[in-house]
Swiss-Prot record:
Gene3D superfamilies: Homing endonucleases. InterPro entries: Homing_endonucl, Sporu_reg_WhiA_N_dom, Sporulation_regulator_WhiA, Sporulation_regulator_WhiA_C, WhiA_LAGLIDADG_dom. GO terms for biological process: cell division; regulation of sporulation. This is Probable cell division protein WhiA. GO terms for molecular function: DNA binding.
Length: 325
């Protein structure tokens, strides 16, 4: 689904000048580099979609007044797909300084510039958008689903992890076969980050496929149950997970950490027994401790829902939900 995300992001209209600058800086940092050609600094970026190259060329001209040239490298031999190389030669050094790729002394900045790292939330979203357009990937929902960005170095990876943290998304920097990557694996976090970047339509498709896969996996497990008690237990687990998801939604940031942890375990491992959830907890807990925390989480959410006059956790346990289980 990588192309879907990039296509949607390349058409996104951004009004904030600061965010547009942050996106350009991030795109250049993650997709390109600085070269010295004939004693001059040349800014270059290699991209995999023509729409991204056109967006970057347009933004460089509108924001900085410099002309970028795009060269098309057709697929052939070792190149599996067409690539687009954007190059700013005549004003390369000026652009590099203005985007923060070079510091005041003319030295290359290894991570992301301070104005992006310490910018607004819009800037953090733009930094992720630029990085994803440059070198991002999104796999289909499943056991190994992930949103990933290949990074030019560990400093850039850490800057991206920090930007994700500011957006409320947990991301991890990893070195895989000598290459630095930033990875988001949690399904909810992937969905949230897609929306933050501006790929809401793709998120909806991704979430639908994720839900369909979960339902299919649950159905496959249930098909193997030959005991009515196991089937009832599975329905109870589906209902409990749905109630917990609703509870976390109702409480938002006000949910105590220890209750949130137990709730997330229930949601992430829908078919696991309380005993199994206890073993998965860090540190491990007894099944009674897990059950107690989930009970308190649901009770707290239901009380808040009553005060706020909104649907409580029981409202999501519909006949259709149980029938699908």
């Amino acid at each position: 689904m990588t192309t879907d995300v990039k296509d949607e992001l390349s058409r996104l209209v951004v009004k904030s000048v600061s965010a547009r600058r942050a996106e350009v800086t991030s795109l250049l940092r993650f997709a390109g580099g600085l070269h010295i050609v004939g004693g001059r600094v040349v800014v270059e970026a290699e991209l995999d979609l023509g729409s991204i190259a056109r967006r970057l060329r347009k933004e460089i001209f509108e924001l900085y007044g410099y002309t970028a040239v795009v060269h098309v490298l057709s697929a052939s031999g070792i190149r599996k797909s067409t690539r687009y190389v954007l190059r700013v030669a005549n004003d390369g050094e000026a652009l590099a300084r203005q985007t923060g790729l070079l510091d005041m002394r003319g030295r290359p900045v290894r991570g992301l510039p301070a104005q992006v790292v310490g910018g607004s939330i819009d800037d953090a979203e733009a930094a992720w958008r630029g990085a994803f357009l440059a070198h991002g990937s999104l796999t289909e929902p499943g056991r190994s689903s992930a949103l990933e960005v290949s990074c030019p170095g560990p400093e850039a990876a850490l800057a991206l992890v920090g930007a994700a943290r500011r957006l409320g998304v947990g991301a991890k920097a990893r070195e895989v076969r000598g290459a630095d990557r930033v990875v988001v694996r949690d399904g909810e976090a992937i969905g949230a980050l897609l929306t933050r970047m501006g790929a809401q339509d793709t998120r909806l498709v991704w979430e639908e496929r994720r839900l369909r896969r979960e339902v299919r996996a649950t159905a496959n497990r249930l098909a193997n149950f030959d005991d009515a008690n196991l089937r009832r237990s599975a329905r109870a687990a589906v209902a409990a997970a749905a109630r917990v998801e609703r509870a976390l939604e109702i409480l938002g940031d006000t949910v105590p950490e220890h209750l949130a942890s137990a709730g997330k375990l229930r949601v992430e491992h829908r078919q696991a027994s309380l005993e199994e959830l206890g073993r998965l907890a860090d540190p491990p807990m007894t099944k009674d401790a897990v059950a107690g925390r989930i009970r308190r989480l649901l009770s707290m959410a239901d009380r808040k829902a009553k005060v706020d006059g909104i649907p409580d956790t029981e409202s999501v346990v519909t006949p259709d939900l149980l029938e699908d289980a």
